[in-house]
């Protein structure tokens, strides 16, 4: 009995990743044993995701305002190289998806379109939505989780407080520290939350509905795996000139796993912030780059848009030449960066990409419906790739800047 309690104590105080793994196994086991019991624990997952989503907006706002207000003069934040990495990574993801889709063309079994959804009419509408999110009411931005608006107001307040008294700056620093402590507590509850999420997912879908889309999923997940395990490490190696895999694997393990099950980049912002702190990155940098990455670093979304659009074109017998495929890569990358400005995210940007090939809106919405069917896996993998890449690129840019400073 004493040995058993000792094992439980070790498990409770041990590795969070190990605890999450236990939660996943327990969730799958419960769903296999009893669907009804699994549905009863779904609220644990909802509570966990709800807590992360609730604290993320105020965390981003206070952390950004505090870090900018307390920033020392002549401090390098390395934001430009990080933004370049985000944009290049998203384009590389779209290009990889094009190549894989051409190597393994997929036919879709089109279903009825999704009711009550209205995709944007063009890239102009996506950009217009993003611009208006930028000047959203700050209280509304915090309430609705509009991270573009939160970032804008956080940066504005931080700049305004830059010349404030030291005591005012210290208040913001203390509040920021307090919220970070709350985030650490919520993250410790991840195994319980993921147990509920996994149990509910297996109980509700059983993954039988998505078995018919195995080839499409193989292309989607294959492209995401290539980006996560080959392209991203290659980009990181170019930046830091050393073996990138320890960093990449750690980010996939500590950020990607949580993001996979929460299926929310916003909910994973506190997890990424905590990981950046563990990696000893500059707070002035990651407090801005992580929420910005959750908004514009959308490699997974670019893959989803590209693969489903080319699958639709192949199903309809439309020949896609190399130039059009390259144009699709650009459109998918730009659209993906605006995915946070569209209700429904990457899936509702598919009609925009389909319009390149003259595919009607009715057919495009049927493709969106296919996306919703495979969404349990597609959305989870997409979020895991997007969110873990935020930390990978931030860490790579910070290390590259440190190496340059040492040499200089």
UniProtKB/Swiss-Prot annotation:
UniProt GO cellular component terms: plasma membrane
Transmembrane segments: 11-31, 43-63, 82-102, 141-161, 192-212, 216-236, 298-318, 339-359, 363-383
Membrane topology value: Multi-pass membrane protein
InterPro entries in alphabetical order: Na-dicarboxylate_symporter, Na:dicarbo_symporter_sf, Ser_Thr_transp_SstT
Function: Involved in the import of serine and threonine into the cell, with the concomitant import of sodium (symport system).
UniProt xrefs under NCBIfam families: PRK13628.1 (NF010151)
Similarity comment: Belongs to the dicarboxylate/amino acid:cation symporter (DAACS) (TC 2.A.23) family.
Name of the protein described by the UniProt record: Serine/threonine transporter SstT
Gene from which the chain derives: sstT
């Amino acid at each position: 009995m004493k040995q058993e309690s000792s094992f439980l104590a070790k498990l409770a105080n041990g590795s969070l990743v190990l605890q999450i793994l236990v939660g996943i196994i327990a969730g799958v086991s419960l769903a296999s044993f009893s669907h009804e019991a699994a549905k009863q624990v779904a609220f644990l997952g909802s509570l966990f995701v709800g807590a992360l989503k609730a604290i993320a907006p105020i965390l981003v706002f206070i952390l950004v305002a505090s870090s900018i207000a307390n920033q020392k003069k002549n401090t390098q934040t390395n934001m430009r190289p990080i933004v370049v990495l985000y944009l290049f990574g998203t384009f590389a993801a779209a290009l990889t998806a094009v190549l894989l889709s051409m190597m393994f063309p997929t036919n879709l079994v089109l279903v009825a379109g999704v009711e009550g959804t209205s995709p944007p009419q063009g890239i102009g509408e996506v950009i217009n939505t993003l611009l208006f999110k930028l000047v959203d009411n700050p209280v509304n931005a915090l309430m609705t989780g509009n991270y573009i608006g939160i970032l804008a107001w956080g940066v504005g307040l931080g700049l305004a407080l830059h010349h404030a008294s030291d005591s005012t700056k210290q208040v913001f620093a203390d509040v920021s520290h307090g919220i970070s402590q709350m985030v650490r507590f919520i993250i410790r509850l991840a195994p319980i939350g993921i147990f509920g999420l996994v149990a509910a997912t297996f109980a509700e879908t059983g993954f039988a509905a998505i078995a018919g889309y195995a080839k499409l999923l193989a292309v989607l997940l294959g492209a995401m795996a290539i980006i996560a395990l080959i392209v991203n490490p290659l980009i990181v190696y170019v930046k830091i000139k050393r073996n990138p895999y320890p960093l990449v694997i750690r980010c996939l393990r500590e950020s990607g796993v949580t993001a996979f099950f929460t299926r929310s980049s916003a909910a994973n912002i506190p997890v990424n912030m905590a990981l950046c702190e563990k990696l000893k990155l500059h707070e002035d940098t990651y407090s801005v780059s992580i929420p910005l990455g959750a908004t514009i670093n959308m490699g997974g979304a670019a893959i989803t848009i590209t693969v489903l659009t080319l699958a639709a074109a192949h199903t309809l017998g439309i020949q896609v030449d190399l130039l059009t495929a390259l144009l699709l890569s650009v459109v998918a990358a730009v659209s993906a960066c605006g995915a946070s400005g569209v209700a429904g995210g990457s899936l509702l940007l598919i009609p925009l990409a389909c319009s390149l090939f003259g595919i009607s809106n009715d057919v495009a919405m049927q493709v969106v419906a296919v996306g919703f069917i495979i969404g349990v896996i597609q959305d989870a993998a997409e979020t895991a790739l997007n969110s873990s890449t935020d930390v990978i690129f931030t860490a790579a840019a910070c290390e590259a800047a440190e190496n340059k400073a040492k040499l200089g």
